[in-house]
């Protein structure tokens, strides 16, 4: 099954929202947090999304619509 690794950054107003939970329920993707650093005012996460390629792309668009910055991780650097 296809997967994609992304680096996401949360602005302060999104830190307390269950964004990853929501994405896992709104789209047919499995989320796997590989690394993270979440503080009171900001946070980042390396996230692996697994599922159909179309659903992965929809989930990324959904994250961006929620105000989260999403960048692809090149060369599987979280391994």
Regions found by a protein language model. Name each.
Residues 1-79:
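Long, contiguous binding/interaction regions
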């Amino acid at each position: 099954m296809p997967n994609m690794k992304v680096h996401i950054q949360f602005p302060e107003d999104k830190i307390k929202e269950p964004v990853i939970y929501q994405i896992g329920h709104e789209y047919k993707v499995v989320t796997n947090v590989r690394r993270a650093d979440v503080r009171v005012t900001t946070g980042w996460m390396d996230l692996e999304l697994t599922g159909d390629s179309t659903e992965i792309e929809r989930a990324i668009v959904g994250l961006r619509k929620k105000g989260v910055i999403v960048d692809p991780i090149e060369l599987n650097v979280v391994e």
